[in-house]
Amino acid sequence: MESTTVVLLGDHYQKDVDKVAFVNHALWKAGLLTVRNGRIKSWKAYAKNCDGSCYIYLHPSVENNAEVQKRTRKVLETLKGREDFGIERILTREEAANMGADENCFLMLEAKEGWFFLDEWEQLTAAEKDCAHGMKGTHGYLPGETDYQTFFAMSGCSIRAGARVEKNIALWDEGATLAALLEIDLGKTDGSVIREMLQ
């Protein structure tokens, strides 16, 4: 056991949720996607959920169409202005990409506290208890929010006893640290080794 290291980590945290926002319903009502036989068949704009956030994509055939961009933004700004809908913030493609999100999205949405997004189109909102998904908590919210962190702990061989890291670390720092612990050279990585934890 003297050559054993135990690592505990989480890749994300959970937030309590009780309301669901279906952005595709509003896009459908605005004529930005079409439904046939109960299924989305074509789209100019489409919302793809990430639980606590949501990507908005424009179809490649219209992604540079100023009118489609304007209509899509208007739908989203209208939803954001509603007390009874779950959009907290709308991010541009550049803002999303700078956080490491999909640079191919047109926009990205952040959910209000207690809300999350799903892809369905049949209704605009629902109480979580009325959804088949049955989620009481979910992840996918934007990083940096208060009380939205996870944990990382190591103990054992090659770990400094009693070491505490008081700075914020990212998942990619955990990966770089685990690679260093295993003496694996990952080359150039996004993360930095958390040296204060290692002997």
Regions of interest found by a model, annotated:
Residues 1-128, 133-134:
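Secreted, luminal/periplasmic, and some membrane-associated catalytic domains
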